[in-house]
Amino acid sequence: MLNFIIKTHRKDTIYTKPHLFVLNKGMNSGKPQKTPFTNSFVIIFQNEEDCESLFFIAYSLWQTKFWHQHLVGSVISFLRLPDFKKQFNPQASLMMVEHEQHQKNVAALKLLEK
């Protein structure tokens, strides 16, 4: 199980542990990036491998517009921190399990091919 902390990013805060930022305002809410956005959440990890793998999971969730259903606001839509926390962990876990199962299936097919 991945261990990470999600909180609101504050300007001029320096993070020593591996981290990534996720935009929380506008129609691009959920977009991950290594550098901070003005309006963003920060996800802090214990190690670099978890950070890297979850970056791509967050990126795929953003590309599939997963976060659009959780946006609120009439003029400038935004993503609430509790909604993000509630949805991100289960989605990340599900996608990690599916990826591991896919890797096992590919390995089994390669063995059958020999």
Question: What spans do the regions from the language model cover?
Answer:
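A short, structural micro-pattern
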Residues: 15, 35-37, 81
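A short beta-sheet element
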Residues: 24-64, 68-73
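A short glycine-rich beta-alpha junction/loop motif
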Residues: 75-100
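Sequence-specific dsDNA recognition surfaces
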Residues: 1-15
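Loop/turn positions that initiate beta-strands
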Residues: 17-19
